[in-house]
Amino acid sequence: MPTPHEAEKQHTGPEEADRPPSMSSHDAAPSGPPSRNPCCLCWCCCCSCSWNQERQRAWQVSRESKLQPLPSCEVCTPPSPEEVQSWAQSFDKLMHSPTGRSVFRAFLRTEYSEENMLFWLACEELKTEADRHVVDEKARLIYEDYVSILSPKEVSLDSRVREGINRKMQEPSPHTFDDAQLQIYTLMHRDSYPRFLTSPTYRSLLLQGAPQSSEA
């Protein structure tokens, strides 16, 4: 017959067998947070930094795709003699001709006033936009590039027009810069256009289209 001590051991044995084995100091789960990435401020920053970088790259690609710089030449085909002669009839005919705008823009570059044509073209492009987000972004860039007094390409606008633009920029539309565009158009018409008609650039185009005299 087992003694009371042996009976107690037999009673407690199965319970101890069912217990999970105790973990050693090597198997114990770490009590602190996961190890930090040395390049981040906290253990979760690594994913956050990577996500922010991807978002920044996507925004930059989107911005560049929407706002490509204007080409240095609208068309590359030479104008006909009749077209060249029509540019002297009126400034409107010059500006309605893609080739005429390209030639006139090259002339403005020699006078260090190309920004006037660039601004006018940017306003024309803005008028074709219907997407609200694109309009907002392009209007902001036009303002920064040609209206802001901090821009090296600032165009000459009077205070009344500037104040009107500042009000309209609170809610931009495709016609935010209409008054400013008209003012720059008038400036080019009265100031640069007469000099263009007497410039070597225009005269050479007229001579190229003139009929050559034949000798008998």
UniProtKB/Swiss-Prot annotation:
Positions of disulphide bridges: none
InterPro entries: RGS, RGS_sf, RGS_subdom1/3, RGS_subdomain_2
PTM comment text: Fatty acylated. Heavily palmitoylated in the cysteine string motif.
Residues recorded with modification Phosphoserine: S24, S97, S151
Main location: membrane
Every RGS domain range: 90-206
Pfam families membership: RGS (PF00615)
Top-rank taxon, per record: Eukaryota
Outcome (variant: S24A): 50% reduction of phosphorylation
A single GO cellular-component term on record: membrane
Membrane topology term: Lipid-anchor
Keywords from the named record: Lipoprotein, Membrane, Palmitate, Phosphoprotein, Signal transduction inhibitor
GO terms for biological process, alphabetical: cellular response to interleukin-7; chemical synaptic transmission; endothelial cell migration; glutamate secretion; negative regulation of proteasomal ubiquitin-dependent protein catabolic process; negative regulation of signal transduction; positive regulation of transforming growth factor beta receptor signaling pathway; presynaptic modulation of chemical synaptic transmission
GO molecular function: actin binding; G-protein alpha-subunit binding; GTPase activator activity; identical protein binding; myosin binding
Basic and acidic residues bias: start-end ranges: 1-19
Region (Interaction with GIPC): 207-216
Quaternary context: Interacts with GIPC PDZ domain. Interacts with GNAO1.
Function: Inhibits signal transduction by increasing the GTPase activity of G protein alpha subunits thereby driving them into their inactive GDP-bound form. Binds to G-alpha subfamily 1 members, predominantly to G(i)-alpha-3. Activity on G(z)-alpha is inhibited by phosphorylation and palmitoylation of the G-protein.
Name under which the protein is recorded: Regulator of G-protein signaling 19
UniProt source species: Rattus norvegicus (Rat)
Gene name for this UniProt entry: Rgs19
